[in-house]
Amino acid sequence: PESEIMCVIKADGYGHGAIFLAREYERLGVKRFAVSNIEEAMQLREHGIKSPILILGFTPADLAKVLADNNISQAVLSEEYAEELSKYAQRDSVTVKAHIALDTGMSRIGFMYQNIDRDFASIDTIERVCKLPSLDFEGIFTHFFVSDEAEEGKEDTLCQYKCFDDAIAKLS
């Protein structure tokens, strides 16, 4: 109930123009955006986009101050990365907003949680990460790898959803 729509406008809005889309989406009431990297996020800021932005990919941890100063949230992809980001945020006396990336089947980025019975150690790791200083965790996300395939991907998407839902319940 407290979740907001976050429009993903990475790769120049998938070729449609990220700045144009961000302005239109803001006008329509969208309050959050997601992009691929720091360059895309800063381009939106340089063109007056004020809404919160989440970077889905990797940002060098030594840019913690840039993230914090520009109201940009960072996807946390691993415990090691979280520790590094926390270290730089503390060094720069800032708090970085963050989201947990949960890998429920895409096998690209995030904390592995593809099997409820096997990957339970990831929950403990995420709980540790969320206690790190100078990081403010706002949310968690996953990527459904075949959700656009109506019948063929239905079972896989449902399995991913169950993993995601289970992780949320365990972390709540």
Model-derived regions, located:
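Active-site-proximal beta-alpha core segment in soluble small-molecule metabolic enzymes
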Residues: 3-170
